[in-house]
């Protein structure tokens, strides 16, 4: 878990270039030093990097690096996964589905959340503020498969509006946090 505290930019007397590893959009990272952040950045790029290679990159002994990696894994790393290329597995269509409902009670949310969570093609699911209440990211083979998923979604719970947009091109996709 990141522990952030507000920092007064006038209070920091060190040049920004020296502070850049600990300043994130006006917040001071109290829990991680510059070496921790370098380790986390490297692991975000490739979580399979050997500790010896990581230690050489960061400028630490292998043992010191291993201890830091272990601590960071325990405190900050949610999970390590392989990120697959959807197109290589036949998922040629990415749909973003905006959902609006007139229901805003716990029972409806539980029903809708559980139902959506059972649909494997829904790879991301968010509750929103603004014009729509929920946003789904769906990966499917084509429009025919999307229509099948759409029909499953609208059967889960009462919805007042469902609007779909299809990605024409993926320009940027990353799981790395901007630390």
Please place each PLM-identified region on the residue numbering:
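A compositional/biophysical signature of low hydrophobicity enriched in polar/charged and small residues
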Residues: 1-179
């Amino acid at each position: 878990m990141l522990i952030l505290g507000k920092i007064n930019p006038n209070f920091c007397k060190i040049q920004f270039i020296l502070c850049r590893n600990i300043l994130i959009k006006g917040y001071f990272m109290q829990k991680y030093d510059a070496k921790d952040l370098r380790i986390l950045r490297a692991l975000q790029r490739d979580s399979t990097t050997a500790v010896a290679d990581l230690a050489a990159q960061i400028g630490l002994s292998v043992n010191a690096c291993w201890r830091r990696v272990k601590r960071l894994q325990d405190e900050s790393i949610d999970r390590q996964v392989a990120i697959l290329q959807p197109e290589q597995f036949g998922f040629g269509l990415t749909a973003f589905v905006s959902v609006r409902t007139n229901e805003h009670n716990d029972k409806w949310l539980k029903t809708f959340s559980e139902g959506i969570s059972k649909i494997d093609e829904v790879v991301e699911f968010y509750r929103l503020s603004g014009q729509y209440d929920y946003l789904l990211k769906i990966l499917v083979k084509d429009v025919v498969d999307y229509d099948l998923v759409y029909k499953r979604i609208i059967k889960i719970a009462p919805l007042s509006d469902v609007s779909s947009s299809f990605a024409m091109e993926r320009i940027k996709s990353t799981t790395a946090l901007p630390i």
